[in-house]
Amino acid sequence: MKELLYYTFIETEVTGAFLVFREKTQNLVFASLGNDKLFLLGKVEGFLKKHEKQDTMYDLQELKEAETYKKSIENYTICLENKMPLPSGAIPFEFLFGTDFQRKVWNELLNVEHGHVATYGDIAKRIGKPTAARSVGRACGSNNLALLVPCHRIVGSNRKLTGYKWSCKLKEQLLNNEKENSLSLSRL
């Protein structure tokens, strides 16, 4: 069985984003950050090939008619530019990939609010695995829904920035933008 996935690339002042939608559900299933569209396309193609299931092959096509996905794309751009925290459900997404443990971690990351951070150890405790901070870190590194599953809000036990799949510099910029945005919103 072939499953159709559509991709598009957006550019913002912060960075670019490569977005992949599942045609069957119209949900976002992959969001990767960076400015090199061809590099990101190659990464996604390699990832999909690696994760093809016995009975499912993925057909990745460029999104030509964006009307169905227009609102999600607009909201992701807002999210990337950190103009405001988006309400839950503003961008429908789903975990098409990932182990049960990874999905448990990713679901817990959804509870780390805009403008706040948590440690890998905090997340490990919240999912009932208090000694699994390193495994939580690996799950964060496997997150393929950048920003929506906010792994950029997770820091080391010393509260310092640690690795980020898309660069520590970008992680710092995203956190600073969220912090500024949260302060601006609290003044209203």
UniProtKB/Swiss-Prot annotation:
UniProt catalytic activity: a 6-O-methyl-2'-deoxyguanosine in DNA + L-cysteinyl-[protein] = S-methyl-L-cysteinyl-[protein] + a 2'-deoxyguanosine in DNA; a 4-O-methyl-thymidine in DNA + L-cysteinyl-[protein] = a thymidine in DNA + S-methyl-L-cysteinyl-[protein]
Induction: In contrast to some bacterial and mammalian enzymes, MGT1 is not induced by alkylating agents.
Disulphide connectivity of cysteines: none
Residue sites binding DNA per the record: Y120, G121, R134, S157
Positions annotated as active site in the UniProt record: C151
Gene Ontology BP, a term: DNA repair
Listed InterPro entries: MethylDNA_cys_MeTrfase_AS, MethylDNA_cys_MeTrfase_DNA-bd, MethylDNA_cys_MeTrfase_DNAb, WH-like_DNA-bd_sf
Protein name: Methylated-DNA--protein-cysteine methyltransferase
Annotated source species: Saccharomyces cerevisiae (strain YJM789)
